[in-house]
Curated annotation (Swiss-Prot):
Pfam families: p450 (PF00067). Heme binds at residue 449. Belongs to the cytochrome P450 family. It is an enzyme of class 1 (oxidoreductase). It catalyses: tirucalla-7,24-dien-3beta-ol + 2 reduced [NADPH--hemoprotein reductase] + 2 O2 = dihydroniloticin + 2 oxidized [NADPH--hemoprotein reductase] + 2 H2O + 2 H(+). The keyword Glycosyltransferase does not apply. Coiled coil: none annotated. It comes from Ailanthus altissima (Tree-of-heaven). This is Dihydroniloticin synthase CYP71CD4. It is found in: Membrane. Keywords: Heme, Iron, Membrane, Metal-binding, Monooxygenase, Oxidoreductase, Transmembrane, Transmembrane helix.
Length: 508
């Protein structure tokens, strides 16, 4: 009897496997379309995946850039079940993000986001539709408007002063600047999100950083081969990620409830205020009936997670790449410090109103965003209908990936693109706000990063203070060329190794 059961199980397993294999081969054969953009050859089941092997898999934008040199700036890849079109030129960026922006306003939800309970309700991956339009409007008009970002200056001023105090306490010694900057950025984002009265703020920051790191470690294979979702289950990564979210959500539940109780105790009399945090704003909009679609506490948590995921690592990564490039380029460091110290001469404290005319420092920031773009592969889009682009057809449901790294290093656009040359942005109208397709670190069109102004503000003030209050030296007798500039690909593309420097106080 046992043998019959085993035989039945074996036969059933074989039939299921055979049908699965047949379906994959059938899908592969029927995915061939002469009008698709050109791309590398495909094999059954894996598609074009084998062409990425041996091409720096750890940094996939390198591999995609190499393939684009062979197959062109609009390239099709079949990665398992995923049909992917990769754009690698400013011309293709404009064609897609401007001329076809509405048709590709959908954003595919990756497997790692689907693991979490809030998938599809956060700012980054909310599906195109009425709720997306509402959350986009709230982000632009309420959460991250220029006025709102400016109103939060007191948080950045306070936290950047604490950053300087912490560094000054270790002056003359080797410090881990990566940890210092990460703590500053995370605390600014936390205070902007839910105020400064949260007793578990540090715990939530720790959990959010762990969650971003854990999300970056989850395999992307299930996006290409859905049946391989079990990998993250048996590896424990799925459970680990969900446990972090569960623990952090308990803190957010308390924070939201405290905000509601505080509003009730004040009789809802305060209304809009420059010192409202994100939770305050969302609760006010819900209470006053200004929203067409009701926002639940779960939606508020999803927004907060979006702000942390998009606002912490991106800003701290940018600051650290700026400092890294300045340490590698002493003449640029000398020039930018001369500007900062001349403009702020004699000041013992620096406010945001003091740094509005630091033209060269902003050029340094732009050049760092070009050369060391935090998101070298912009968050993908999805075609909601068939498109014709540059004579090729992109079928509906095709994922569209923008290789911004390839564009910001295109020698046809940028002279000496591998070099750090901030002067290229002096008296140059090119900006990062989404209308110059050769420089789109925050994306463009309907899906441009809504927190762009917030992210830039979180870099400018601490950077000005780091350059003003300290002279900087590499440790252990290192020379500029010795500094390791290896990147690590993840949710953002930051330094693989922490940045260790020696600060010496500058007497203004």
């Amino acid at each position: 009897m046992m043998e019959l059961q085993l035989d039945f199980f074996s036969v059933t397993s074989f039939i299921i496997f055979f049908l699965f294999l047949f379906r994959l081969v059938w899908d592969w054969k029927n995915s061939t379309d002469e009008k698709l953009p050109p791309g590398p050859s495909k094999l059954p089941i894996i598609g074009s995946l084998h062409h990425l092997f041996g091409r720096n898999v750890d940094l996939p934008y390198y591999a995609l850039t190499d393939l684009a040199k062979i197959y062109g700036p609009l390239m099709h890849l079949q990665l398992g079940k995923m049909s992917l079109v990769v754009a690698s030129s400013a011309k293709m960026f404009k064609e897609l993000m401007k001329e076809n922006d509405l048709a590709i306003s959908q954003r595919p939800v990756p497997y790692v986001a689907r693991v979490l309970e809030d998938a599809g309700r956060d700012i980054a991956f909310v599906p195109y539709g009425d709720y997306w339009r509402q959350i986009r409007k709230i982000s632009r008009m309420e959460l991250f408007s220029v006025r709102k970002v400016q109103a939060l200056h007191y948080i950045r001023e306070d936290q950047s002063s604490k950053l300087i105090e912490s560094i000054r306490a270790s002056a003359g010694s080797v410090i881990n600047l990566s940890k210092e900057v990460s703590h500053y950025t995370s605390t600014v984002v936390a205070r902007a999100a839910f105020g400064s009265g949260c007793k578990d703020q540090d715990k939530f920051i720790r959990l959010s950083l762990e969650m971003v790191a854990a999300a970056g470690a989850v395999s992307t294979l299930p996006d290409m081969f859905p049946l391989l979702g079990f990998i993250s289950v048996i590896s424990g990564k799925k459970a680990f990620l969900k446990n972090i979210q569960k623990e952090a959500d308990k803190i957010l539940d308390v924070i939201i409830d405290e905000h509601i109780q505080r509003m009730k105790s004040k009789g809802y009399e305060e209304g809009e205020s420059d010192k409202e945090d994100i939770v305050d704003v969302l609760l006010r909009l819900e209470r006053t009936g200004e929203l067409e679609i009701s926002i639940t506490p779960q939606d508020i948590k999803a927004v907060i997670w979006s702000v942390f995921a998009g606002g912490t690592d991106t800003s701290s990564t940018t600051t650290l790449w700026v400092m890294s490039e300045l340490m590698r380029n002493p003449k640029v460091m000398e020039k930018v410090q001369a500007e900062v110290r001349e403009m702020l001469k004699g000041k013992t404290e620096i406010y945001e109103s003091d740094i509005q005319d630091l033209t060269y420092m902003r050029a340094v920031m732009k050049e760092a965003l070009r050369l060391r773009i935090p998101g070298p592969l912009l968050l993908p889009r999805e075609a909601m209908e068939p498109l014709e682009v540059d004579g090729y057809v992109i079928p509906a449901k095709t994922k569209i990936l923008f290789n911004a790294w390839a564009v910001t290093r295109d020698p046809e656009i940028w002279k000496d693109p591998e070099s750090f040359i901030p002067d290229r942005f002096i008296e140059n109208p090119i900006d990062y706000k989404g209308t110059n397709y050769e420089f789109t670190p925050f994306g463009s069109g309907r899906r441009i990063c809504p927190g762009m102004n917030f992210g830039i503000a979180n870099v400018e003030l601490p950077l000005a203070k780091l350059l003003y209050f300290f002279d900087w030296k590499l440790p252990y007798g290192m020379k500029p060329d010795d500094l390791d500039m290896t990147a690590k690909f993840g949710v953002v593309c930051g330094r693989k190794n922490d940045l260790h420097l020696i600060p010496t106080p500058y007497d203004p």
